[in-house]
């Protein structure tokens, strides 16, 4: 189920506060976050956000196409090692 429209999108307040402070000062630094469920707002465009994937932080450069998606979508948690192949002797 999707989130109720009357509630609005979930955006981590701490993350949003950091991005807005960087927009005012004009700085461009990497912001670390564990908030994978946070929605990407238009204020985040142009920033690099390091999203935790359970093991390490994956840097995600936010573009206009990403607005409306969640941060966790761009930080995969599992590594694909390939399907079992034919064992050649």
From Swiss-Prot:
GO terms for molecular function: rRNA binding; structural constituent of ribosome. One of its GO terms (cellular component) is cytoplasm. It comes from the Bacteria. GO terms for biological process: ribosomal small subunit assembly; translation. The keyword Amino-acid biosynthesis does not apply. Keywords: Ribonucleoprotein, Ribosomal protein, RNA-binding, rRNA-binding. The keyword rRNA processing does not apply. Belongs to the universal ribosomal protein uS19 family. Protein S19 forms a complex with S13 that binds strongly to the 16S ribosomal RNA. NCBIfam families: rpsS_bact. This is Small ribosomal subunit protein uS19. It comes from Porphyromonas gingivalis (strain ATCC BAA-308 / W83). The gene is rpsS.
């Amino acid at each position: 189920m999707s989130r109720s429209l009357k509630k609005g999108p979930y955006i981590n307040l701490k993350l949003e506060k950091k991005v807005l402070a960087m927009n005012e000062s004009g700085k461009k630094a990497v912001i670390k976050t564990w908030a994978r469920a946070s929605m990407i707002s238009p204020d985040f465009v142009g920033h690099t956000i390091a999203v935790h994937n359970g093991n390490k932080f994956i840097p995600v450069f936010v573009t206009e196409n990403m607005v409306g998606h969640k941060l966790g979508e761009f930080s995969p948690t599992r590594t694909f090692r390939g399907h079992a192949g034919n064992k050649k002797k």
